Amino acid sequence: MQTQEEASNPLERNIELSVSREKVEAEVGQRLKRLAPKIKIQGFRPGKVPMKIVAQQYGHQIEHEVLGELLQQQFSESINRENYRIAGVPNFESRNPGTDNSNYEFRATFEIYPNIELGDLNSITINKPVLQIGDVEIQKTLEVLRKQRTNYESVDRPAQTGDRVNINYQGSLDGKNFAGGQADNYSVILGNGHLLEDFEASILGMSTGQEKTFDMTFPEDYSGKEVAGKKVTFTITLNKVEAPKLPDVDGEFAKSLGIEDGNVEKMQSEIKANLQRETTQRIRVKLKEQVMQSLLDKISVDIPKILVQQEIDRLIEEVQDTRTARGFPKASNLQRDTFLERAERRVRLGLILSRLIETHGLGVKPEQIKSFIEEHAQSYENPEQVIKWHFASPERIKEIEPLVLEDNAVSWILDRANIVDQNVTFDELMGYSHAANT
C-alpha cells in the first residue's frame, strides 16, 4: 500500500490497493458451491445443475460482490493503520482489472478531515447589547399596534399622504390600452410605496368626484416590458377619500389584543413581557453571531471539498422546499456557485464547533433539551401543546440536539470572553422599524 498527498488539495489522499486474485477466486468458488443446491434451471433437477453452468450464470455477479467486499475491507484496514478520518465517500479507480491472472489493482482517492488547532480562545472580545424595556418602548409598540388596527372614515377634503383613496384609472400607450393599465374601484393607501411616484403625485390634492388626465413616463426597469421607459397617458377619477383614524387605547383595544377582560394595565404588562422576551432572544442571536465570526476569524482550517458540495446540495434543497411550501414551482436554473461561499462558511464553522465540543466535552444533556423546548414554546399561543408535540417524536428531539450543541459552544466561549456592555435602543437591537407581537 502506498499513500500520496495531493499538493493542490492538502486534504486529498491516494492509496494504492491490491486484491489477491487467488483470494477472490477461492471465495467465489465457495459461494458458487453454496448457491448451487438452491438454484433452479430448466432441464436440470434441483441441486443437480453442473457447476460450470452455475458459474456461467452467476459467476460474474458473485465475483463483482466478492471483489467489492475485499476491496472495502482492505481499504478500511489501510485507513485505520494511517488513522485517517474519511470525509465523504472514496472513489475507487481500477488500475489493473486482473484479466491477465494478476492481482486486481485499484487507486482509492478520498479526502480526510483536517486537524484543527483551536488555539487560545480566552482573548475574544464580545460586544453585548444592553437594553431595559421601559415606557418608551411600550408606547412605541402601542403606536404600531394602533396603526395596524387603523380604521378609515370618509372625508370631504383633498387627498393627502396617509389617506386611503378609491379610484378608477385608464391608461393608454400611443392611444391604445395596455396590460394592467386600467382598473375600477381600486383602493390604495397614499404614501405606502405601492404606487409609482409620479402616479401618486397626480392623486394628491384631488377631491372626491374629480377627474384628471396626465402624462407620465414609466421607469426603464419597470417590470411591465410593454411600457418600461415609455410615456403613457392616464385618466383618473377619484371616487372616495378616507382619512385614517387610530383606535383609542381602551378596554376594547385591549380585547382586540386578546385581553379578555379588557384590562389596559394587563395589556401593557403583556406587551412589556413580550418585548423583554423578544429582546432576550435578539441579544442571544447577536452574541451568537459574534462568537461564530470570532471563531472563523481566529481559527484557520482547510475544508474538504466533498463536504462543501454536500452542503450546497442541502442549501439547494432548502430553497426548493421553501418554494414548494409557498406554492411556487421548483426552480430549474439554480447555479451552484451562488451557494459556494455560504456552504464553505457552514462547513468551516461546523468543523470548528465539532472540534470545540469534542475537546471540552460540551455534549447535550437531557435537561438541556427540555429547557430549550420549554423556552422556545413560550413564543406560541399554547406552549404546553408545543412542548408535548416535540416530546412525542424522537425525530423532533434529534433535530434539536445540534441547536443545543451550538448553544453549549457559544456559552463556553462567552464564559471566557471579554464582554463589553453596549447600550442600544430597541430599534437598533432589532435592526428594523419598531414592532412587536402580542
UniProtKB/Swiss-Prot annotation:
Domain PPIase FKBP-type residue range list: 162-247
Subcellular localization(s) per the UniProt record: Cytoplasm
GO biological process, any: protein transport
One Gene Ontology MF term: protein folding chaperone
Keywords: Cell cycle, Cell division, Chaperone, Cytoplasm, Isomerase, Rotamase
Disulfide bond positions: none
UniProt record similarity statement: Belongs to the FKBP-type PPIase family. Tig subfamily.
Domain remarks in the Swiss-Prot or TrEMBL record: Consists of 3 domains; the N-terminus binds the ribosome, the middle domain has PPIase activity, while the C-terminus has intrinsic chaperone activity on its own.
Name this polypeptide is given: Trigger factor
